[in-house]
């Protein structure tokens, strides 16, 4: 076997097949032989097949079931600042290719494994980059990588005022990392004082609280699905369940809906949705602070005249063991929406859970339609926006399902 620059992990044939197929993760139970001296947490290591063939180099995670996350499959790569600069430039060039120019000020700049930055998310909100670091390798790389992020985008003429870290995520514990949030100190720079900003997407303005909002502050993955709803909303009476800060509801209202009701169980979310409606000068909207599971049966009983319903719930499951319960939840809200809609009405329904696969989601929709004595006329099937790329061979990158139906 060729001499390696880094400690070597030998994996079994199962892992070899996954890695050759494009997956970047090595699980601890797939390791046949570990280095005699365990590398430091977050250090680099090589991965080889049972016969010693080089499979890749990645970051070691000693506290995780995912022992190695590959960053390269080229044995000749040197992992210096120039290497990471090229990676950032490549990721940004991809966004410039697949997104419309107006969408580049509110987009996902780095999408973890799909961009070969395992465990790293970087979202851009106007002049702020908001990061979430969920692997120890990326955590240790921050002093090199984060200044490069600002440099590369600025070199392209983008205005970047600062980088804010949203590492208040429980998953960091699996990497032996603490939770925290705050400004990253770019060398020689002072960060902005405010942790709030404004973005524009599809011609709709949003207030973004990237310190306290969910995830990094705003969900960018539905940008083109929101546009699909706006195109269809004109003249309709729309109910947007799980509205969060109002994104689908605002697009429907701006698209010419006769009336839009935005509903969410969170009073804070409703307050933000109202603020966004005011910012956009939309007066054809109402707001309800109510649990969708109670709201839909109540509206059906009262006979409310909605002819377009949007269901964009948070993930009902984040693990395989809870998928069955999650699918029952998805079926309940979709069944109730179909019952509430008149024949000929429209349903937009989504799931952001990777574990609720498209196959399971379609099966659930068929069952809900059967129980509701409705048929579904498919208008569009969509997925996450292309700044959240789906990497074949890495099913974890494929998570968002979005269906637009006429209910007949």
Model-based region annotation:
Residues 1-126:
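Non-catalytic accessory regions of SAM-dependent methyltransferases
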Residues 306-336:
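Mobile active-site "lid"/loop adjacent to the S-adenosyl-L-methionine
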Residues 259-264:
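Conserved SAM-binding motif I beta-strand of class I
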């Amino acid at each position: 076997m060729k001499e390696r620059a880094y400690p070597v992990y030998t994996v079994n044939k199962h892992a070899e097949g996954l890695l050759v197929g494009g997956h970047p993760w090595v699980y601890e139970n797939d390791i046949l032989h570990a280095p005699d001296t365990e590398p430091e947490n977050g250090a680099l290591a090589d991965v080889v097949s049972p016969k010693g063939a080089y499979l890749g180099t990645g970051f070691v995670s000693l506290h995780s079931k995912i022992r190695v996350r590959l960053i390269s499959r080229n044995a000749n790569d040197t992992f210096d600042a120039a290497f990471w600069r090229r990676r950032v430039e490549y990721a940004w060039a991809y966004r410039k290719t697949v997104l419309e120019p107006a969408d580049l000020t509110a987009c996902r700049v780095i999408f973890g494994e799909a961009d070969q930055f395992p465990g790293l998310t970087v979202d851009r909100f106007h002049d702020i980059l908001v990061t979430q670091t969920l692997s120890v390798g990326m955590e240790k790389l921050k002093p090199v990588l984060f200044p490069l992020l600002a440099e590369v985008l600025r070199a392209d003429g983008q205005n970047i005022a600062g980088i804010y870290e949203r590492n208040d995520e429980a998953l960091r514990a699996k990497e032996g990392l603490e939770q925290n949030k705050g400004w990253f100190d770019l060398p020689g720079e002072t960060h902005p004082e405010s942790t709030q900003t404004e973005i524009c997407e599809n011609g709709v303005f949003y207030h973004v609280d990237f310190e306290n909002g969910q995830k990094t502050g705003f969900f960018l993955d539905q940008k083109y699905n929101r546009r699909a709803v706006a195109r269809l909303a004109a003249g309709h009476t729309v109910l947007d369940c799980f509205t969060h800060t109002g994104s689908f509801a605002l697009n429907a209202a701006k698209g010419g809906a006769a009336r839009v009701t935005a509903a969410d169980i969170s009073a804070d979310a409703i307050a933000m949705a109202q603020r966004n409606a005011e910012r956009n000068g939309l007066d054809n909207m109402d707001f309800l602070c109510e649990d969708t599971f109670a709201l839909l049966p109540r509206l059906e009983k009262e006979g409310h005249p909605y002819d377009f319903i949007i269901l964009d719930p948070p993930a009902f499951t984040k693990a395989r063991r809870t998928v069955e319960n999650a699918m029952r939840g998805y079926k309940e809200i979709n069944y109730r929406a179909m019952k509430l809609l008149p024949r000929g009405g429209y349903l937009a329904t989504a799931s952001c859970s990777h574990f609720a696969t498209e196959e399971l989601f379609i099966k659930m929709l068929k069952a809900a339609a059967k129980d509701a004595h409705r048929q579904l006329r498919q208008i569009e099937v969509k997925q996450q926006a292309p700044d959240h790329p789906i990497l074949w061979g890495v099913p974890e990158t494929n998570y968002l399902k979005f269906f637009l139906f006429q209910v007949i």
